[in-house]
Amino acid sequence: MVDPSLFPESAKFCTMNVANHSTDLTRFNMLHPLERALVAHAVDIRKAEFGDARWCAHQALADLGRDSSQPILRGERGMPLWPSAVSGSLTHTNGFRAAVVAPRLLVRSMG
């Protein structure tokens, strides 16, 4: 469980607990093809982590009232490229995935 008081009121977040070493690709397979292509050659556990975290990001964007249908691609250093008016952060580790987003006018950066 994540403590909502850790985030500003304007932030929306999504968390997911999964089985350790999960290779469930359900959410990965739901991603935009351009997102799936970012890790197309990775092992299944990496695809599952990536897919779950990106899926959480899309859920959080929708909760924020933003278009969640566009792919969240990567910048040159691997960071997520959020929509222009949004700041956010992704995380994934064994058994846990999460994303948090907020309007950039109110929250300049997160991480």
Sequence positions of predicted segments:
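Core catalytic alpha/beta fold that binds nucleotide/phospho-ligands
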Residues: M1-M110
